[in-house]
Structure formats: structure tokens, C-alpha cells
């Protein structure tokens, strides 16, 4: 495991707390965090180091949270 991957994994619990607070659903939160970690690990070069790693990951997570809400609101309306 690379140092970058270790740093990302170290932040997973903080990302989970944020996602749970926003979504109020553990399964949805876990999905959003997993998608965030995957996106970060697939393109580590996207992290330019201009901010803290946590700030960058939370930015990705916010987009994934919106995706989760959209996905589940569509399912609820079906």
C-alpha cells in the first residue's frame, strides 16, 4: 500500500462521521465514503497538494453525498 493510500485510509473514520451526519443512513454513508476513497485512489495525481488531503477528500465526498441523495430520491419516487 502506498503512503498516499495509507493517508487516505487514515481519514476514512472522519469521512464516515461527516457522511453519517449528512445522510443519517449508515449504508448510504458507507457507499459514499467508499466511492470517495476509490475516486481518490484511482487518481492520486488529482491531489495537487494545494490544500490539506482531508479538505480535498471532503470536497469529493460532498459530491458523492449529493449523488447518493439523488440516487435514493429517484428510487423512492419509483
Tell what function each PLM region has.
Residues 1-17, 21, 27-30, 41:
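A short, charge-rich alpha-helical start-of-domain segment used by transcription regulators
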Residues 7, 11, 15, 36, ...:
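Residue-level preference for hydrophobic side chains embedded in well-ordered alpha helices
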Residues 25-26, 50:
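Short loop-to-helix capping motifs
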Residues 31, 35, 67:
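Acidic active-site catalytic centers that drive phospho-/nucleotidyl reactions
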Residues 35-53, 71-73:
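Sigma70-family region 2
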Residues 48, 59-78:
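Arg/Lys-rich amphipathic alpha helix in sigma70-family domain 2
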Amino acid at each position: 500500500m502506498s503512503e498516499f493510500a495509507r493517508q487516505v485510509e487514515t481519514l476514512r473514520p472522519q469521512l464516515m462521521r461527516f457522511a453519517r451526519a449528512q445522510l443519517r443512513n449508515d449504508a448510504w454513508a458507507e457507499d459514499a465514503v467508499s466511492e470517495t476513497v476509490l475516486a481518490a485512489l484511482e487518481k492520486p495525481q488529482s491531489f495537487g497538494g494545494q490544500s490539506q488531503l482531508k479538505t480535498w477528500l471532503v470536497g469529493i465526498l460532498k459530491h458523492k453525498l449529493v449523488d447518493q441523495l439523488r440516487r435514493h430520491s429517484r428510487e423512492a419516487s419509483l
